[in-house]
Amino acid sequence: MRLHKIFYALFENRLSDNLEELVQGKKAVESPTAFLLGGQPGSGKTSLRSAIFEETQGNVIVIDNDTFKQQHPNFDELVKLYEKDVVKHVTPYSNRMTEAIISRLSDKGYNLVIEGTGRTTDVPIQTATMLQAKGYETKMYVMAVPKINSYLGTIERYETMYADDPMTARATPKQAHDIAVKNLPTNLETLHKTGLFSDIRLYNREGVKLYSSLETPSISPKETLERELNRKISGKEIQPTLERIEQKMVQNQHQETPEFKAIQQKMESLQPPTPPIPKTPKLPGI
């Protein structure tokens, strides 16, 4: 029981510090908006913030679950125990912190950005319903990125994090990425049908808006998203990314991993075929 009280006190202290830091330079508004973000792992959801900052003139608070994972009071000990699998052991803590922060800040009416993936519909529906009860307008902005690009994005992110700190680098299994890709279009269609979101938008990595339910309310986002997820990428487009990842993996000494071998195979497949060496014609009498 005493340990529970200590943990609760540590959590409340950290929550207080997080709230104080997040509200710096931000103002509560009379008619607040919450932006829920979606997109498969590696799609680059951070880039959605640019459009939102422009829309709110920067008066918005970003709540990113990942930033709270290392705040777990036993994080260092858990890293030693579980190494790169530590994420799943600290996620319950970061989820609790995220929920507490959303609750406290929404009570006061701050504009919010809430990161997610869109793997399920339950969480966005519950969040949007709760926020609307507090007077919020709710919107959903989703990354529409070809699945090969986002999968490579998960590998590059891991290699970059590994170079910085091998013990806390966050790996995304390909299966988790592919499940998100498979479910996202249907989930987004379900969310569109609920009518909970005043606007559902799709953006690519360049920040170009590909779809808005506000502009085309009778059209589901599913078709546009599926088309972009399955869009074929040319070798010219993908080669710089492959070369960049290969270089990082060599630096991290990850040449023996299945991912490295797959990257090399893909790069080899992009090389133009070697033309056959022409045969030297035989001279008469030789």
Curated annotation (Swiss-Prot):
Reactions performed catalytically: UDP-N-acetyl-alpha-D-glucosamine + ATP = UDP-N-acetyl-alpha-D-glucosamine 3'-phosphate + ADP + H(+)
The protein's enzyme class: transferase
GO molecular function, one term: ATP binding
InterPro entries per record: P-loop_NTPase, Zeta_toxin_domain
Keyword Transferase among UniProt keywords: yes
Described function: Toxic component of a type II toxin-antitoxin (TA) system. Phosphorylates UDP-N-acetyl-D-glucosamine (UNAG) on the 3'-hydroxyl group of the N-acetyl-D-glucosamine moiety, yielding UNAG-3P. UNAG-3P inhibits MurA, the first committed step in cell wall synthesis, which is then blocked. Phosphorylation is inhibited by cognate epsilon antitoxin. Part of a postsegregational killing (PSK) system involved in the killing of plasmid-free cells. The zeta toxin induces programmed cell death.
Protein name per the record: Toxin zeta
Source organism: Enterococcus hirae
